[in-house]
Swiss-Prot record:
Annotated stretches, region: Disordered: 1-381, 439-464, 488-774, 861-1003, 1266-1403
Organism: Schizosaccharomyces pombe (strain 972 / ATCC 24843)
Function: Component of the protein complex eIF4F, which is involved in the recognition of the mRNA cap, ATP-dependent unwinding of 5'-terminal secondary structure and recruitment of mRNA to the ribosome.
Keywords, in A-Z order: Cytoplasm, Initiation factor, Phosphoprotein, Protein biosynthesis, RNA-binding
Protein family (similarity comment): Belongs to the eukaryotic initiation factor 4G family.
Pfam families, A to Z: eIF_4G1 (PF12152), MIF4G (PF02854)
Compositional bias annotation for Basic and acidic residues: 298-308, 537-714, 741-754, 986-995, 1284-1295, 1383-1403
Modified-residue entries (Phosphotyrosine), positions: Y923
GO biological process: cytoplasmic translational initiation; ribosomal large subunit biogenesis; translational initiation
Polar residues bias locations: 1-11, 19-39, 50-60, 109-137, 249-269, 346-381, 439-460, 493-508, 720-737, 1302-1313, 1328-1341, 1348-1358
Official protein name in the record: Eukaryotic translation initiation factor 4 gamma
Phosphoserine sites (modified residues): S83, S452, S455, S456, S459, S866, S882, S886, S911, S919, S921, S1333
Gene Ontology molecular function terms on file: mRNA binding; structural molecule activity; translation initiation factor activity
Subcellular location: Cytoplasm, Perinuclear region
Encoding gene, per UniProt annotation: tif471
Amino acid sequence: MSSKPPSNTPKFSYARALASSQSNKSNSTKASENNTATAEKQAVKPSGVEPTNTSRANAQKKTESTGKITSEADTEKYNSSKSPVNKEGSVEKKSSEKSSTNNKPWRGDNTSKPSANSSAERTSSQHQKPETSSQIGKDNAAPVENVNEKSTSQETAPPVSTVPIQFGSITRNAAIPSKPKVSGNMQNKSGVSSYSSKSQSVNSSVTSNPPHTEEPVAAKPEASSTATKGPRPTTSASNTNTSPANGAPTNKPSTDINTTDPATQTTQVSASNSPALSGSSTPSNTSSRSNRQNHGNFSEKRHYDRYGNSHPSYNKYSHYQHGFNYNNSGNNRNESGHPRFRNSRRNYNNQGAYPTYMSNGRSANQSPRNNPQNVNNGSTPIQIPVSLQTPYGQVYGQPQYIVDPNMVQYGPILQPGYVPQYYPVYHQTPYTQNFPNMSRSGSQVSDQVVESPNSSTLSPRNGFAPIVKQQKKSSALKIVNPVTHTEVVVPQKNASSPNPSETNSRAETPTAAPPQISEEEASQRKDAIKLAIQQRIQEKAEAEAKRKAEEKARLEAEENAKREAEEQAKREAEEKAKREAEEKAKREAEEKAKREAEENAKREAEEKAKREAEEKAKREAEEKAKREAEEKAKREAEEKAKREAEEKAKREAEEKAKREAEENAKREAEEKAKREAEENAKREAEEKVKRETEENAKRKAEEEGKREADKNPEIKSSAPLASSEANVDTSKQTNATEPEVVDKTKVEKLKASEGKSTSSLSSPSHSTSSKRDLLSGLESLSLKTNPKSEQCLESLLNSQFITDFSALVYPSTIKPPSTEEALKAGKYEYDVPFLLQFQSVYTDKPMKGWDERMKETVASAFSDKSSRGMYSSSRQSSRSGSNTHSHAGPGFGGPSERKGISRLGIDRGFSSSGAGFGSGSNYKSAPSRGVSHHGHGGMSGSHRGSQRGSRRGGGERDKPDPSSLTIPVDQVAPLQLSANRWQPKKLTEKPAETKGEDEEALLPPEVVQRKVKGSLNKMTLEKFDKISDQILEIAMQSRKENDGRTLKQVIQLTFEKATDEPNFSNMYARFARKMMDSIDDSIRDEGVLDKNNQPVRGGLLFRKYLLSRCQEDFERGWKANLPSGKAGEAEIMSDEYYVAAAIKRRGLGLVRFIGELFKLSMLSEKIMHECIKRLLGNVTDPEEEEIESLCRLLMTVGVNIDATEKGHAAMDVYVLRMETITKIPNLPSRIKFMLMDVMDSRKNGWAVKNEVEKGPKTIAEIHEEAERKKALAESQRPSSGRMHGRDMNRGDSRMGGRGSNPPFSSSDWSNNKDGYARLGQGIRGLKSGTQGSHGPTSLSSMLKGGSVSRTPSRQNSALRREQSVRAPPSNVAVTSANSFELLEEHDHDNDGGQKDSNSKTSS
């Protein structure tokens, strides 16, 4: 795992690298010389030990100290090892054979020989005297060449301390490396990192160790050789060899031993490179030259053959990174003893530049267990030169790519404190048992360029131990030393070694063998080493305990301080957070309050401004309306005053004229009555005298006339006329001058004329007859004519007879009549042009009521004329009756009457066509006189003949006309006006006095009630706008009210009308919407306030009134128990039934009215859902009224609710509940089918089946609907008029005698217009006077030679009857026998033929 290097890393430079290399060479040379001199001066001699054995004792002590330091990690490695070590000998043998090929050892081999004595001594001196250890390190730093020379001069190679190392399934012993100590005061002046140089020096001392996990073994060779036979001890006293490197006693001084003995030098180097337990920092640097030599002497091929792909670069991306070594010595620690981490590019340990080998197939060795695990000791990772680093991301075995030298290259690093997984960490206890050296030649150890960890010299720092495998605990008996209380390990014999000869031969060099040490010296040396080791161990344990106690106390203090600081910081943070939260909440509350206050103020200001604007606009509107109303009222008042003045004047004039007329009439009536009374008295006296005189004169005249008539008949006729014409002028003058004595002079003139006529006429009979005629005419005229007519007649009586008409002279303006044409057959007739000349002069009617008489005469003439073409007329009846009588005997009372009437269908045809025979006529006809006068049949006589006979033959006179008995117009008195007579209110009621000149009077509630109710009754879709405007004008009266009384009254009347007429709910809902939109905002109710305590105004007030009324009635509900079946027949006619029916009608009307209001957006959808939920609340035992109201409401608003998404989901729920209701067992069928109709209507898109549900229609819509129905009926009419083989027009005796005509339908009149038109043509044809028989049309058509077929309609039969009447057959002999018998026989034959034809058609 790598981390990104710091950004301030200096860029690579070849010049700087060259200067650094040269500086390292010079520094290494100087450091070697200084270290040699310092080591000779400051050699430490342990007390109580012989001079010859000083170096050995020191070395042993150092070795024991080093073993103590590394014993914990090594023991853990040994215990964790699970692989056997029986192949150790073979591995070592193999290694020795490979290394024996080199006659000359590698330059760096001597640095890898372990020396525990120098390490232990160095460690001990570091604990006791830090300044001394620095000097000792200088003394021990000897050149490598010196060490090699000394080692070759010895005869016998000393045994080397080994440690078992496991390579997968192979275990071998590896020598414990050591390296001479170099000066720690050397400064890094070359620009190469001190960490890199330190790690290089350490790695150079352990190049013989392979990069695998090291395993500790027993101290003695015997233990290692017998390891396969029994379990290994879990703890050991020491891991180092106690004998010198050459294995023989030496009498050289300690300084020589320190400087020349390779084992001592390597031990000292190892001790110097081991981490200080006391936390002190001792810088230790090696030269760059030795590093370059170590890199140059790396045996690449031998390393590859021995370890395979176990190099860290081969497992570059593994989680278990290896090949790194951390050096905690030198300047890597600060003043407090803690590791110092440097953020420099040179501080990163990059992989060495390995050659690109191809894979050899040994992939099994690449597992994490076969790779060495480095202990993270907390120091900064080690970095090698950039020129030797492998490019980051380069895979082993692949060709290298060229890297820019100016590019910063970094390798993967291990963070401090990193402990890999899967391998637990265990601590070892030190052991003191010495082991004989198993020396090997320096040539047998392979060099490595990559620094590997030195397990013998490096110890974990900050409590970290090497990662080793856990070994099985040994069950061998332990031997404890009573003095040191440590375990004693029995040393093994050299003969027990697997191959001692090979082991010794490994250490052999081309030089002479070293001298052998006697047993006494060996035992002495061993005792000395033991004492030194025990002392050192004790001191080390005390120091370690003290250090641990101090460290623990320090750590505890730091932890306590840190914990207190954290707690304090936490409390402060909590308090701060709490305080901030409180401040924030307070601030937010203040801001919210402030914002709300601002919003309220703003809202109030806006509302105030809006209210002011509304009030201002309202005031302006009111003022404007007031001005307009004032102007209008003023104009109306002026017009009204003017009109009233005119009416008053007119009325006064009429009254005055009427009074005057009444007075005049009264006066004239009085005078007339008085005059009539006088005249009556006088007339009675004169009449009495007149009667006597007339009787006498009459007798005489009759006698004379009779005689004269016998003599000259011409004089009889001409004399009266001549005398009358001669007396015309004199009668006029007399009438003009003496109008009052007309009756008195009448008799005198009559007598005078009589005398004249007697003297002038030669024949007395002629004069007598003429007198008699004149008197009789006078008598009749005086009784029936008015006074003016009587005057004319009197003048006629006074006129003279004209004897010669040609002698008469007429005025120039008058054209005389034609005398030649006038004198014919003894008569004189005036032509019409001559008489028309006097039209303008003679304007008097002949008698009273002349116009009425003439109207009656003309009307009777027209009625007689029109009745000629009708079957109901008396003239036609008499005419047809006479004809029928001649054929069929007297009337229809004969034996064939039943057959004729039943077969002809006269009872049906005549009654339907308006004939006089039937009583059930469908059409009104002219009054028939003939039938009423002449009784049954009406055919025995002629009404016209009887009427003429009565008039001409002096029959019974008609009763006198009632109009002639009434008093004249002049004598009619006006009606007296009663006091309590009816008069229009406009005339009777005086205009109400206004409160002021500008104010109009308010209509009282009863007037509003009457006017609004009348307007609502007259409201239709065509008059909707006009009538609604009138009602709105009345409702606007509430502007002058504070409680909206008039508006409430209008709403109440509208609501009652809408609920009482459910079919017109749509129209009344539209009217309510118009009122809400058009109502004035000035209308208010001070008793109804809104949420701001302001009176509700305008349309909102109207909506509130209306909805409150709807809600009140809807919540109260309705329930009407209507009677059903026979049990309720008595109740149907009762008053309670009608009341209940009205309640039910209004309840359903209310529901529909509410739905119509919702459709016009006056009610919200939420209110509709609440209503539906209320009606669907009970699904177990619902009321009939609720279900019926629900169905009516859903049929009204269902389509609107179902159109929205939310409403559709709610409607699904409603339908489910309705289905639940339909499944109730005892539910009435009416309610069930009603619910099913609603559900079916929803499935069909809310289609409405009932026409009533669709609402009112205009007249145009009704006409269009009628036309559509007519077209549909015509399209559905059958092409043939036959019905089951029988005539639809004719009756049949076998079908009840009434005929088989189908009943009339609603479209008969429209469908039969053409038939009635043809019937009218037939009637007009009858006026021509043609006569025909009443026989059947089939007979007539048959007689004419046509086919006997039944017609499909009555109109066609009437047309045939008309044709038969017009053209009677001439070739058929009419006999006195009944012609209907022939029809009967023909019908029997035709019925059979028709049946045969029907059977053929059906087959």
